[in-house]
Amino acid sequence: MELDHEYRPRIHFTPAKNWMNDPNGLVWHKGEYHLFFQHNPQGRQWGHMSWGHAVSKDLLTWEELPVAIAEDDEGTIFSGSAISDGEDLVAFYTRHTETNQSQCIARSKDNGRTFVKYESNPVLDENKKDFRDPKVFKYK
């Protein structure tokens, strides 16, 4: 889809439609930069938070991909981070409910095109309403 609109940013990524906030999880993996962001795939207002996904080879030209990590019956998907373990992309994100936020993991074995949530999620749960945005990085 060609986006040519007077009020759209020319350098910063924006999705083709609907709500976006909190870019997170920028990571280089197998020849591509992966940008994840909070995204409401259902509308232009805040809600139904999932992780949107875009890729770029030069950080200027972006290709929007389908939602990387979607909300489910266990909660919506808030910000976090992502790392490359050399083979796979691993995402660390916040699962949000009305009463609790916890930290979860999802893994992609196909260069970020699909993610599978870890079956033992949450991996960190302090039973708190405001406990979000895990920052994870790989150290040699």
Task: Give the location of each predicted region.
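Beta-rich carbohydrate-recognition and catalytic domains
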Residues: 1-140
